[in-house]
Amino acid sequence: MQTLTIIRPDDMHLHLRDGDALKAVAPYTARQMGRAVIMPNLKPPVVSVADALAYKARIMAALPEGSAFEPLMTLYLTDQATPELVREAKAAGIVAFKLYPAGATTNSDSGVTDLFKLIPVLEEMAKQGILFLVHGEVTDPEIDIFDREAAFIGRVMKPVLAQVPNLKVVFEHITTAEAARLVLEAGDNVAATVTPQHLLLNRNDLLVGGVRPHHFCLPVLKRETHRQALVAAVTGEKAHKFFLGTDSAPHAKSAKENACGCAGMFSAMTAIELYAEVFEKAGALDKLEAFASKNGARFYGIPENADTITLVKQSQTVPASVPYGDGELVPMRAGGEIGWTVQY
């Protein structure tokens, strides 16, 4: 039977929620990943060092006994952010600030209204070596939802990189050929995370044969040509600029199967297996370890994990749902097969 042993991966873009939801989902990530970059879009958002440290303590309390998993904490960038906050964050071990354009995604109401007013804050991030994580979509109602990432590149990303050229930027959960091209052409201070859904699915998987609410995420799934461009990027000559970030974003089944359903796909329970499928289909299994376990650590300036995990070429059936607080949670590929299984 085919096996693949790799350095334990890291999830460089993860939503763990809070309270009972946190307790339900944290063990799935802790089982596979050594570390994860934790998104700060709680209600209310994680905007201060005190918020982040308190949230980290709640995450640690939700982990299985004996877990070595390490959450890497971030702050939610707001219009009120200051260079002093950046210095405080650095001193406290916060790894990054996250940009949510106001209204772009779940719990983004506190997001930034004009990033260019925060240039002194971004300059301090560059000085302190704190990363800038970007949800790269414009929220202008005149821009079609399928075009919001591409529009963001010209309107925001390129001008910001020109004004703060040494800022370390992660273009999060990229979904388009345009975003991949920007990262490929930019300096080594610009990288990107890519989700399993944007490597495996296209917008037909959302809309053909009925609306599939469990395939609804933001940024929304794009055309097949964009999916192919992402696969080419993560397996190509400059693959070191791309790394694993699931954007696993749990919502209760009742909130997804809804007249106004929430955006987000829960992939944490089988994340590395789904990525293995992508790389296997692309004939690039030898590049999975760098994507999952090396590139992100290098970009964040942290050592690779010291231990390994082993994947077996053995099919598994994903549960139709798992418990989630008072309700249930539908994972990515629910009820379906994945051709790889982690040996636990």
Swiss-Prot record:
Reactions catalysed: (S)-dihydroorotate + H2O = N-carbamoyl-L-aspartate + H(+)
Role noted for this protein: Catalyzes the reversible cyclization of carbamoyl aspartate to dihydroorotate.
This protein's name: Dihydroorotase
Assembly behavior: Homodimer.
Keywords: Hydrolase, Metal-binding, Pyrimidine biosynthesis, Zinc
Species, as recorded: Neisseria gonorrhoeae (strain ATCC 700825 / FA 1090)
Active-site residues (renumbered): D247
SUPFAM superfamilies to which the protein is assigned, alphabetical: Metallo-dependent hydrolases
Cofactor-binding details, from the entry: Binds 2 Zn(2+) ions per subunit.
A GO MF label: zinc ion binding
